[in-house]
Amino acid sequence: MSQSDTIAAIATARGRAALAVVRTSGPAAIEIVDRCFRGDALTDADSHTAHVGVLTDEAGTDIDQVVATVFRAPNSATGEHVVEVSCHGGDLAPKMALQSLLDHGARMAEPGEFTERAFLNGKMDLAQAEAVADLIDATSTKAHQASLTHLKGRYSDLLGDLREELLNLCSLVELEIDFSDEDVEFADRERLEDLLDETEEILGDLLDTYPTGEKLKDGVQVVIGGRPNAGKSTLLNALVGHDRAIVSETPGTTRDEIEAEAEIEGVLFRFVDTAGLRDTADEIEAEGVRRATESIEEADVLFYLYDLTVGLDSQEIAFLQDLADDGSDVQPVVIGNKADRAPDLPVATLDGLTSLKLSALEAREDADEVQPLLDHLTDTVAEHLSRAEASPVVMNQRHRQHLRDALDAVQQAREALDAGVSGDMLTLDLRAALQELGAITGEITNEDVLDQIFSRFCIGK
């Protein structure tokens, strides 16, 4: 990517709308727009000023009445000269406006190129740039809030403080090396141990937030499982508030997984209605059962339905008890369904598992019927929500890996200190940890990493 040229792209979504914005950034941005703008001379305009005029094409034909907003470098989003042309929405006017800018000397922007230029010009670090993509992709209120926290720099500040601590450690050790022939002590062993222990604890705490960040970003997967005709599809429809799955009295109606989403307490929950679990000679249904089993193993929460009038068989009890006993991450909830047909029958209780009964059929008309399930889901994410509100959380797998590697390096430094290894070897580990943290914020990076990160973005961002 060259920063010597000027780029342009439509920055707003396609489709019918009151307004659209065509953005241009680069050394010639103001001159290029001025060539096709009939109104105030934009080349004479002050920064952060808006100008009403008419945009024309290469032949001088009017395209649209527009507002051109000028931002002069370095006081712009990208750190370069930027002009944002606001035209009428729809498909045609923005396309014609963009084409005019391209005809007058701009180049079509690559995906994420505006944000990449902001990063390269020091307007944001790499973690903040990635937060822009996360903010755009956010599918729930809490994911949006967590991404905004990163964009505002709280996460980067935390990493910056950690790097400062490691630099302090490195400085102390290197001073000891430089003055090893003299009777000068810059930091005693206990002080170095304390600093390493503190750094290790902070890194460990940060890594512990990743499951929270992952759930906020990707959502919580709730699998609805059980025997055929237990009422799984009816429950799915009740949980999401509309008919998403076909409901039939015929066992085996659901042969493939059906997914639906709902936001509860600001968190995205992904509900998966699975094929009924049973032995079958039907190849298509058998494939559905296989997929259902896989989904249960990957679930965050399992709502296991059974018909109260039929009860749980020994195979189901063993399956659920195994999930409870083997320390699985899956949290099963045993649900006795069709309580409207058997109001006096108790729900099955299994050691270590939550059990309740309801009527999924009645729940479609009465939201209170599924409220205990919604409360349970809220409880499962309560700790995550509390953690996200208290401090920034790690939401990015790339960051997680760099933090793991930084933690490994700090732990190796601690072991080296305990073993009495020379200061030279100790600083190698500390410098390795510094590099890993620098890779998160972009202080240390390479072109391939940048290409991979910014390719996630849409054109115009």
Curated annotation (Swiss-Prot):
Gene3D superfamilies: P-loop containing nucleotide triphosphate hydrolases, Probable tRNA modification gtpase trme, domain 1, tRNA modification GTPase MnmE domain 2
Binding positions (Mg(2+)): 233, 254
Domain of life: Bacteria
GO molecular function annotations of the record: GTP binding; GTPase activity; metal ion binding
Binding site for (6S)-5-formyl-5,6,7,8-tetrahydrofolate: 23, 84, 123, 461
Listed Pfam families: MMR_HSR1 (PF01926), MnmE_helical (PF12631), TrmE_N (PF10396)
Sorted UniProt keywords: Cytoplasm, GTP-binding, Hydrolase, Magnesium, Metal-binding, Nucleotide-binding, Potassium, tRNA processing
TrmE-type G domain residues: 219-382
PROSITE patterns: G_TRME
Cofactor note: Binds 1 potassium ion per subunit.
Binding residue positions for GTP: 229-234, 248-254, 273-276, 337-340
GO CC annotation terms, alphabetical: cytosol
Enzyme superclass (EC): hydrolase
Subcellular location as annotated: Cytoplasm
The protein's Enzyme Commission number: 3.6.-.-
Purpose of the protein: Exhibits a very high intrinsic GTPase hydrolysis rate. Involved in the addition of a carboxymethylaminomethyl (cmnm) group at the wobble position (U34) of certain tRNAs, forming tRNA-cmnm(5)s(2)U34.
Complexes and interactors: Homodimer. Heterotetramer of two MnmE and two MnmG subunits.
Family: Belongs to the TRAFAC class TrmE-Era-EngA-EngB-Septin-like GTPase superfamily. TrmE GTPase family.
NCBIfam families: mnmE_trmE_thdF (TIGR00450), PRK05291.1-3 (NF003661), small_GTP (TIGR00231)
Protein name: tRNA modification GTPase MnmE
UniProt lineage: Bacteria, Pseudomonadati, Rhodothermota, Rhodothermia, Rhodothermales
